[in-house]
Amino acid sequence: AVIFYRSKNPSKILGIKRGDKMKLSTKGKYGLRAMIDLARYSEKEPVSIGSVAARQGISERYLEQLVALLKKAGLVKSIRGASGGYVLEKKPSEISVGDILRALEGSLEPVKCAAFDTTTGEGCMASDGCVTKYVWQKINDSINDTVNQIMLDELIQESKSINPDGECENPKCSQ
């Protein structure tokens, strides 16, 4: 059992290291936007990375890296040829926000002690005797439950309600 003593640093007791933050990187944020865009505009034909990048205001080079991760995860596929581009590998109703974020970010655990992997040694070794592990596991479960329940087709509908005509509102689109 791990016994914690009074500490001037409560973060240490909670298993939080300096720099730990519960927020998504630009990979997750931009990748989710790109997937919504791709789902919306590739219903009839493949979509180029350039057109997604222009509509979303994302660097084409950075978007290529994100699409490579999404392709590796089996969420998108490339179509070769003159009218090629990218399309979804599955129906939007079969792709969750959780699938997308995990493909881009890896684990969504708020802190490493939410899950200790005995095979790799990843996480907090003291987690078995740590009272706060329960808190982090509950938060982790809530995050995963939430992102797994939101499906890409719901976000497409939301996108259409915000911008019904589908016209690009980014000034870079007309360039």
State the predicted function of each range.
Residues 50-56:
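A short alpha-helical element within helix-turn-helix/winged-helix DNA-binding domains
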